[in-house]
Amino acid sequence: MAKKKKMSKAESKHIEKILSMGCCVCVNLELGETPAVPHHISNNSMGMKSSNYEVIPLCPVHHTDGGYGVAVHQGRVQWEANFGTEQELLDQTMEWLNL
């Protein structure tokens, strides 16, 4: 198994900034800013995890706990049909951060 690479200070600061925005799906649904966890988007690079700069903020419900179509890890295709693609949400997140 590959050794985990330690996150740089810049990566850690970037993720903290993203998480401070709250869940991007909840914000889009006008549910307010709910506490978020980092979700690394799927970049289709042969199972490799995306970089720590390809992260969107999702609440636990929209990340893992919400069930099919509500949580990205419970059914990505339906989730993206409901809320937008991961890339669209990443682009929106970067726009919110003025990056």
Task: Briefly describe each language-model feature range.
Residues 3-7, 89-90:
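Terminal targeting/leader modules
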Residues 9-37, 61:
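Short cysteine-rich loop/turn motifs with clustered Cys
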Residues 34, 54-55:
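Conserved catalytic motifs of the protein kinase core domain
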Residues 36-43, 59-65:
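Histidine-centered catalytic micro-motifs
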Residues 46-54, 64-99:
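Polybasic, low-complexity binding patches
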